[in-house]
Amino acid sequence: MSEKLVAVDIGNTSVNIGIFEGEKLLANWHLGSVAQRMADEYASLLLGLLQHAGIHPEELNRVIMCSVVPPLTTTFEEVFKSYFKAAPLVVGAGIKSGVKVRMDNPREVGADRIVNAAAARVLYPGACIIVDMGTATTFDTLSEGGAYIGGAIAPGIATSAQAIAEKTSKLPKIEIIRPAKVIGSNTVSAMQSGIYFGYIGLVEELVRRIQTELGQKTRVVATGGYAALIAEGSRIFDIVRPDLTLQGLRIIYQMNQA
């Protein structure tokens, strides 16, 4: 049995887990981010997924994680130590990423954003804007030399849809889809239009303004749970890479084994 690498991206909404053999992503699953869920519960879910994929737990003794949810960081460390006899490498201070962070306070930058930057720096060299669409949508900018120079943070598309439903008396919760037309013929279709096409406007305008400040048209890479859906209605992206964060974790793990 060949050794495999487990890459775990713990976000506010979901936990993205990838299994690598070398550079090949063999399997990819998403679990809900539930701070109250016990390590035993997550272990049971993961072991079931591994069994279904035909992957033996004994092969998984290399693990790397990044997290924006501290309680779940602890939970998943326990999962891998107790059930896989593996001590995860957690992306944070002291971990090599290859990314020079040029921010007022580098420690403020989320681990997931550094991981995305590490992936883009290797996979798509040169000036780059990474648009990661999840609970929040982040716009991360790399210089021509691959340094992380900042960006922007906006509410995610699902977060926006949830907020308008919760903060109004009569507007319902909606499914986020790509509408056939902009002019909605009822309340739901009007909301879907406003959320979807309005969000495309937000993304495109922020990308253009970042490029204007940089003084050049850069490569734009989209990732995150809503990347493919937004890319259906926009030509602003050069690359759509849903597994960018997992690839960044793989790259950082290899970098820290040298």
UniProtKB/Swiss-Prot annotation:
Cofactor note (record): A monovalent cation. Ammonium or potassium.
Enzyme class per UniProt: transferase
UniProt keyword terms in alphabetical order: ATP-binding, Coenzyme A biosynthesis, Cytoplasm, Kinase, Metal-binding, Nucleotide-binding, Potassium, Transferase
CDD domains: ASKHA_NBD_PanK-III (cd24015)
Gene Ontology MF terms: ATP binding; metal ion binding; pantothenate kinase activity
Binding site for K(+): 132
Its EC number(s): 2.7.1.33
Short name of any one Pfam family annotated for the protein: Pan_kinase
Binding locations of substrate: 110-113, 187
Cofactor requirement: NH4(+); K(+)
Positions of ATP binding: 9-16, 135
Pathway(s) this gene product operates in, as recorded in its UniProt entry: Cofactor biosynthesis; coenzyme A biosynthesis; CoA from (R)-pantothenate: step 1/5
Active site, renumbered: 112
S-S bonds: none
InterPro entries per UniProt: ATPase_NBD, Type_III_PanK
GO BP term, pick one: coenzyme A biosynthetic process
Reactions mediated catalytically: (R)-pantothenate + ATP = (R)-4'-phosphopantothenate + ADP + H(+)
Cell compartments where the protein resides: Cytoplasm
GO-annotated cellular components: cytoplasm
Homology family: Belongs to the type III pantothenate kinase family.
Described purpose of this protein according to its UniProt entry: Catalyzes the phosphorylation of pantothenate (Pan), the first step in CoA biosynthesis.
Subunit structure: Homodimer.
Name listed for the protein in its UniProt record: Type III pantothenate kinase
